[in-house]
A protein has these predicted regions:
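Conserved catalytic cysteine-centered active-site region
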Residues: 162-183, 223-263, 267-274, 320, ...
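Short, well-ordered amphipathic alpha-helical segments that serve as non-catalytic structural scaffolds
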Residues: 188-204, 233, 339-355, 429-437
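Short acidic, glycine/serine/threonine-rich loops at helix termini
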Residues: 224-227, 259-262, 287-293, 324-325, ...
Length: 507
């Protein structure tokens, strides 16, 4: 069977300190319910600088400057480590400062809804020219204006505590096109655009070779008649210059990225498309989500970055890791919600299809939330909790002995390093490292697991989850082992059919 492969992955973070207070859900709700609270007075004192965010170890892992194994060697909490010197750019992507991101929101705005002051544009324009040369055809959109002439409904754009622009509403009465929604959607679009650019840069991919895009964030764009009509995918493709691509949006809360990887792989495996890009931008609402707990404990607000990623899936090239589309796990409607049932469906079931043991998987990528964030908020170490459940399942199945639980977790698990941006930590942060580990490294098989809490949408209480197995490529490409390609086979078949038809006519 000829399987699709992972061809590359790009990852970005965007430092958005002013958005924490103005646009994060926790601070926004607090302003409405308790406008004079001590938390709102104190939170600005707990926001990190751009340099601190760049130097933060988990962020350096996210963009590929350090590996998960290197992160394991550092004692927690990681936010206390002050002597590390990080870099803006990494192997997989970059950490974007807030001023440049606001300018990119303007560049990604297709309806002239973003207004920036002339002073701000003058200060940021040289940075955009230098750091985002691929967007040069759109640089004319980055122009300043008089921002004092605001309309009634607008979302302020703030940098270093100063209003430098605003987002207009897109319709007088349509609640789905008000300034707040347009702001959130432009945040998703712009961060998705940067993620796609980083993928193209890191792996030197020709944008014209991509023919489909699957966008899998947690926002929705539409109007009063179709709130989630879409389409982020095609809007991102347009800005990035994927001129031969179309696309669509896929949603599934935190499980969406793994759903998207499976869907993209199926599209390539079936031959519908050759190269499919899976992409997602970040969620401004989740900035400072656990800020109250962090501030209460005297910590910095650790949820101070937007996240984004892009993964390219293509036809088997004989080199990159293969995606086993026949070894997929899924949480069915009738599966149940107990930990044993969930892990059985997502981990054991796909392995059973190939008569594999849980120990035959070298590494599991699960919900890779940074435990610095979650432990201080009382939610524990999420990746570790997942690995404990997988280890317990392995022991129940007889794949390991109970005394091996700890060593199993150490050998098969990863430390969490991704921001708590919902879909962002879910399985996909490891794909960049996975490509290296299963080509140049010592690993042969991995599993990506994505899980989601569907009750948040109030349509069902069901849990959700999907998983897929990834393996080292053995170099064999179906149809080419004997020096013959798929296209050549098609030509031979077509010629044979023509000969048969001609002979039948002559008779």
């Amino acid at each position: 069977m000829n399987y699709p492969v992972f061809k590359g992955a790009g990852y970005i973070l965007v430092h958005t300190p002013d958005m924490i207070v103005r646009n994060g859900s926790t601070c926004s709700i607090e302003r409405v319910t308790n406008p004079d609270s001590e938390f709102l007075k104190e939170v600005p004192n707990h926001i990190r600088s751009y340099e601190e965010v760049v130097n933060y170890l988990p962020n350096q892992v996210y963009i590929g400057n350090k590996t998960p194994d290197e992160l394991k060697a550092y004692p927690m909490p990681w936010y206390d480590i002050k002597d590390e010197q990080g870099q803006r750019h990494g192997k997989f992507g970059q950490i974007v400062p807030q001023d440049e991101f606001l300018a990119l929101m303007k560049i990604c705005d297709a309806f002239d809804l973003v207004k920036l002051s002339e002073e701000f544009v003058a200060s940021v324009r040289p940075k955009i020219d230098e750091n985002f040369k691929e967007l040069a055809p759109l640089f004319d959109k980055l122009e300043g204006t008089d921002i004092n002439d605001k309309e009634d409904d607008f979302e302020a754009l703030v940098h270093e505590g100063k209003v430098v622009g605003y987002v207009k509403k897109a319709h007088d009465v349509d609640v789905n096109l008000n300034a707040h929604v347009i702001f959130e959607n432009l945040v998703v679009k712009a961060s998705g655009v940067i993620s796609a650019l980083e993928l193209l840069r890191s792996y030197k991919i020709n944008p014209e070779d991509i023919d489909y895009v699957v966008e899998c964030s947690e926002e929705a764009c539409g109007d009063i008649n179709q709130r989630g009509g879409g389409n982020f995918a095609k809007s991102i493709a347009e800005v990035v210059g994927l001129v031969n691509a179309t696309g669509s949006d896929l949603r599934g809360f935190c499980a969406a990225p793994t759903h998207a990887l499976i869907s993209a792989s199926a599209l390539v495996k079936s031959g519908v498309y050759k190269n499919v890009l899976v992409v997602a931008g970040g969620a401004s609402a989740k900035l400072g989500m656990n800020g109250k707990d962090h501030v209460k404990k005297g910590l910095p607000v650790l949820e101070d970055v937007l996240g984004g990623f892009a993964v390219l899936i293509g036809e088997n090239d004989g080199v990159n890791p293969i995606i086993r589309t026949d070894l997929v796990g899924k949480h069915n409607v009738g599966t149940g919600s107990s930990p044993q049932a969930v892990m059985g469906a997502l981990v054991a079931n796909p392995l059973d299809k190939a008569n594999l043991k849980i120990t035959d998987v070298d590494v599991f990528s699960v919900e890779m939330q940074n435990p610095d964030i979650t432990k201080s908020a009382g939610a524990g170490n999420v990746p570790e909790a997942n690995y404990k459940m997988i280890a317990a399942l392995a022991a129940m199945r007889g794949d390991i002995e109970k005394k091996e639980l700890k060593s199993f977790i150490e050998a098969k698990g990863l430390p969490g390093w991704a921001p708590t941006q919902g879909h962002i930590p879910s399985g996909v942060p490891y794909v960049g490292f996975l490509i290296d580990d299963l080509t140049k490294g010592d690993k042969n098989r991995a599993m990506i697991v994505g899980k989601g809490s569907l009750f948040l949408g109030r349509m069902t209480n069901l849990f959700d989850g999907v998983s897929i197995v990834i393996e080292r490529n053995n170099g064999a490409v179906e149809g080419e082992a004997a020096g013959i390609s798929k296209d050549e086979i098609r030509k031979i078949i077509a010629e044979s059919m023509r000969k048969i038809s001609q002979e039948m006519l002559e008779e």
